[in-house]
Curated annotation (Swiss-Prot):
Protein name in UniProt: Oxygen-dependent coproporphyrinogen-III oxidase
Keywords from the UniProt entry: Cytoplasm, Heme biosynthesis, Metal-binding, Oxidoreductase, Porphyrin biosynthesis
Free-text function comment from the UniProt entry: Involved in the heme biosynthesis. Catalyzes the aerobic oxidative decarboxylation of propionate groups of rings A and B of coproporphyrinogen-III to yield the vinyl groups in protoporphyrinogen-IX.
Localization in the cell: Cytoplasm
Similarity annotation: Belongs to the aerobic coproporphyrinogen-III oxidase family.
Region ranges (Important for dimerization): 242-277
Pathway listed: Porphyrin-containing compound metabolism; protoporphyrin-IX biosynthesis; protoporphyrinogen-IX from coproporphyrinogen-III (O2 route): step 1/1
Matches recorded under InterPro entries: Coprogen_oxidase_aer, Coprogen_oxidase_aer_sf, Coprogen_oxidase_CS
Species of origin: Shewanella woodyi (strain ATCC 51908 / MS32)
Alphabetized GO MF terms: coproporphyrinogen oxidase activity; metal ion binding; protein homodimerization activity
Superkingdom, taxonomy of origin: Bacteria
Enzymatic reactions: coproporphyrinogen III + O2 + 2 H(+) = protoporphyrinogen IX + 2 CO2 + 2 H2O
GO BP of this protein: protoporphyrinogen IX biosynthetic process
Cofactor(s) listed in the protein's UniProt record: a divalent metal cation
Amino acid sequence: MSVPDVSVVKAFLLDLQQRICDGLEQLDGEAKFKADSWKREEGGGGTSRVLTQGKVFEQAGVNFSHVTGAAMPASATAHRPELAGRSFEAMGVSLVIHPNNPYIPTTHANVRFFIAKKEGADPVWWFGGGFDLTPYYPFKEDVIEWHQNAHDLCLPFGEEVYPKYKKWCDDYFYLPHRDETRGVGGLFFDDLNAEGFDTSFAFMQAVGNGFLTAYAPIVQRRKETQYGEREREFQLYRRGRYVEFNLVYDRGTLFGLQTGGRTESILMSMPPLVRWEYMYTPEENSPESLLYSDYLTPKDWLSLNK
């Protein structure tokens, strides 16, 4: 197995953060990201970049973090008990984008690297990440294109890669208490190291680089779509699912909070405005009901493109 090079991973992640922020500023056309660097008492730190009240994006947060610690947190050792007691180093770029227009989907992406060390033993390391899409008023062609981009970036690494990580994404971004997926999925991978450092790193780079390629065309296509109070109210209601998932199920959120991460950066994924409504049910045969009937259970989206 090739030896992990932490400095090369960090350089890529910092560059990725910059490129994604540049791309989002270009899409917005007005607002700019504000950078906020922070240090963590136990070791490490990061830079959070947040764009607010833009022409296109109500809020977009793109966070880089590189943290170190003397012992692995419970969230990381729950499914890897053999790592308990090891020192660790974790770095990644994580982003969530909440658009103004309900016809533009919310999106999330994350790429990360983790290494755990113990004197007298080989380091244990892995990559993880992915991206997913959460529409409010979905367009089938947008969802198919999103999955086509995900498929195409996976293909050089093997034909089995996209179906495997697409299913993992569907399974991960699922709310059991609602019996629905958070959105229409994408890719999710974790514990990636079996192919060695170089190949694993190359795949993580492909996912990071592929995010804007997949998301930007959807934003361009939908950003001028007219909407009213009804659509806005539905968007705010559905944003509640984002909050529910992130605070109850998301491993990254739990890891950040358990390792003494910076709370503001961890919770910047939260939508700036959100609403809940008791016993809400969409009107039958309405555009809102289409989301529930056609988009919140896993589908083979690429088969619909044939």
